[in-house]
From Swiss-Prot:
Mg(2+) binds at residues 25, 27, 85. Keywords: Cytolysis, Dermonecrotic toxin, Disulfide bond, Glycoprotein, Hemolysis, Lipid degradation, Lipid metabolism, Lyase, Magnesium, Metal-binding, Secreted, Toxin. Its cofactor is Mg(2+). It is found in: Secreted. It comes from Loxosceles apachea. Coiled coil: none annotated. Its EC number is 4.6.1.-. Glycans are attached at residue 250. Its main location: secreted. This is Dermonecrotic toxin LapSicTox-alphaIB1b2.
Length: 273
């Protein structure tokens, strides 16, 4: 999965997919009542990027729905996965469940079209703080009470705080999550970060009793760091330059081993060689 980083304006969906992304990451900010409000990152952000592009969250979802609904004039067949980077740092811990419920209702109405031929992309809820695990249970409760528990089949999870892998496993246990787990590791492109924790996550993914299904690394903008991440065995790379990742995947060393994921590749299944 080539994951376009910080896609917060509707116009950027086309831009990143046309550069080779089959997945995008979008920032979600919340108001003081735990309503998802804007797709907005803010300053500071990655080096070389504009930090302040934004939409109202529900408007972004409508644009995203068009981009992922077959038959729509804005449809992109290859856009198959969306990571919502949930900026829950502005919330109190006890608001996490409410944030999950409100997020689910927004998605149900504006992205899934109340279950009637909505957008088809898989969705990853990426949460920065392990203490906010109730966002997951709230999300699930809301979809169930709205009569659409089947949409949970399209939803996966990520804790993005680079926490100890044992602590992450524990948070999932508390949230009642068994599967659909993406594990991120990374840092802003302005700084360097080694691959030690990525290798631990990959080892967990490939063990018989691990909790991780997929591992992605962020934010990778250079050819050599792309090669290093692929050599470590990641499933996804988040980038500001999807064309750079696509170029490296075309190199003979990687062409035989990796391919770009399509809609038929289940993002919740651990890949077995």
């Amino acid at each position: 999965w080539i994951m376009g980083h910080m896609v917060n304006a509707i116009a950027q969906i086309d831009e990143f997919v046309n550069l080779g992304a089959n997945s995008i990451e979008t920032d979600v900010s919340f108001d003081s009542s735990a309503n998802p409000e804007y797709t907005y990152h803010g300053i500071p952000c990655d080096c070389g990027r504009t930090c302040t592009k934004w939409e109202h969250f529900n408007e972004f979802l409508k644009g995203l729905r068009k981009a992922t609904t077959p038959g729509d004039s804005k449809y992109h067949e290859k856009l198959v996965l969306v990571v919502f980077d949930l900026k829950t740092g502005s919330l109190y811990d006890n608001q996490a469940s409410d944030a999950g419920k409100k997020l689910a209702k927004s998605l149900l109405q504006n992205y899934w079209n109340n279950g009637n031929n909505g957008g088809r992309a898989y969705i990853v809820l990426s949460i920065p703080n392990l203490a906010h695990y109730k966002l997951i249970t709230g999300f699930k409760e809301a979809l169930t009470s709205e009569g659409h528990p089947e949409l949970m089949d399209k939803v996966g999870y990520d804790f993005s705080g680079n926490d100890d892998i044992g602590d992450v496993a524990n948070a999932y246990k508390k949230a009642g999550v068994t599967g659909h787990v993406w594990q991120s590791d990374g840092i802003t492109n302005c700084l360097l970060r080694g691959l030690d924790r990525v290798r631990k996550a990959v080892a967990n993914r490939d063990s018989s009793n691990g909790y991780i299904n997929k591992v992605y690394y962020w934010t990778v903008d250079k050819r050599q760091s792309t090669r290093d991440a692929l050599d470590a065995g990641v499933d996804g790379i988040m980038t500001n330059y999807p064309d750079v990742i696509a170029d490296v995947l075309n190199e003979s060393a990687y062409k035989a081993k990796f391919r770009i994921a399509s809609y038929d590749d289940n993002p919740w299944e651990t890949f077995k060689n």
